[in-house]
């Protein structure tokens, strides 16, 4: 990764990813000898310089709202939707022929699934079209001595599987005050909180929201096997309080639907607070064009 410098402070990629597009004023990509001379070996992969927005002198408050809503859906048929229960019966018989064992499915089994139109598709229970919505409200302005910019934003999104959700709240406040003719104080505050929720998946790290392996595992869910039953034990075509755990080869007691919609889940809350205080000192009274800057920053997770 390149080196990320946000408002003059070296930050990590996570801090860069948390930036909202609305709060960025300027962004530059540097990779040359001069850059290396300033930032050293850490700039070997280049430097990304980001300056966030600030206020404008002698300007009345200007409010700006931006919002969006987006959703997506697959352009191709999902892999697990490409076969049905009859195809599973054919597959089981084909395996038996290859192994030289009696066929497990005869006309009675075929008639049962065909005539009753039974097809237990895992995607009917756990798949959804993902969506996200973003909203931000900002105000900026200033007087002849004070400039300010304040922005609050909200993001909510849900993934392709139910029980995959994320919410993020962000707040930024950039204040600049001319203390004297020669000294300007800048106070930048950046705070955000993200709330991630996903179903428990034992084969992914707790911080992994992708759960790629689940998509592959849904291929193994047989269309002939119900995922739930009613109290009396009869198969159910909907989610009930009685999940059925079937063996799938080496998988013992596996129910991909209940794994996603059941009461096993992970909730992760992350909070970040970044504060920067700096003083720009004009030393023109010593030598024309001479200036210096003193900066302190605080980062909390």
Where are each of the predicted segments found?
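Residues embedded in well-ordered regular secondary structure
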Residues: 2, 46, 54-162, 201-202
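Short, glycine-/polar-rich solvent-exposed loops and beta-turns at beta-strand/coil boundaries
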Residues: 17-22, 39-44, 164-166, 201
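Structural signature of outer-membrane beta-barrel domains
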Residues: 32, 68-74, 155-159, 192-196, ...
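Transmembrane beta-strands of outer-membrane beta-barrel proteins
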Residues: 63-65, 148-150, 185-187, 290-296
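A surface-exposed, glycine/aromatic-enriched loop/edge motif typical of exported proteins
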Residues: 75-105, 192-247, 301
């Amino acid at each position: 990764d390149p080196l990320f410098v946000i408002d003059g402070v070296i930050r990590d990629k996570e801090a860069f990813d948390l930036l909202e597009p609305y709060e960025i004023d300027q962004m530059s990509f540097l990779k040359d000898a001069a850059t290396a001379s300033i930032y050293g070996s850490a700039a070997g992969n280049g430097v990304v310089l980001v300056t966030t927005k600030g206020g404008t002198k002698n300007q009345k408050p200007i409010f700006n709202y931006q919002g969006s809503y987006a959703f997506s859906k697959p352009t191709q048929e999902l892999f697990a939707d490409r076969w049905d229960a009859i195809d599973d019966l054919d597959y089981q018989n084909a395996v038996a022929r290859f192994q030289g064992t009696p066929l497990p499915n005869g006309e009675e089994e075929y008639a049962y699934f065909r005539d009753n139109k039974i097809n237990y598709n895992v995607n009917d229970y756990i798949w959804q079209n993902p969506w996200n919505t973003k909203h931000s409200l900002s105000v900026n302005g200033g007087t002849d001595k004070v400039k300010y910019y304040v922005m609050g934003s909200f993001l909510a999104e849900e993934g392709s599987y139910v029980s995959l959700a994320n919410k993020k709240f962000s707040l930024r406040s950039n204040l600049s005050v001319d203390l004297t003719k020669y000294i300007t104080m800048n106070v930048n505050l950046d705070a955000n909180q993200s709330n991630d929720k996903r179903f428990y998946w034992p084969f992914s790290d707790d911080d992994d929201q992708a759960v790629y392996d689940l998509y592959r595992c849904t291929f193994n869910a047989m269309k002939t096997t119900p995922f739930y039953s009613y109290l009396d034990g009869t198969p159910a075509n909907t989610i009930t309080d009685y999940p059925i755990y079937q063996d799938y080869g080496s998988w013992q007691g596996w129910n991909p639907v209940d794994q996603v919609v059941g009461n096993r889940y992970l909730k992760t809350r992350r909070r970040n607070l970044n504060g920067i205080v700096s003083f720009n000192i004009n030393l023109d009274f010593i030598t024309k064009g001479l200036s210096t800057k003193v900066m302190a920053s605080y980062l909390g997770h």
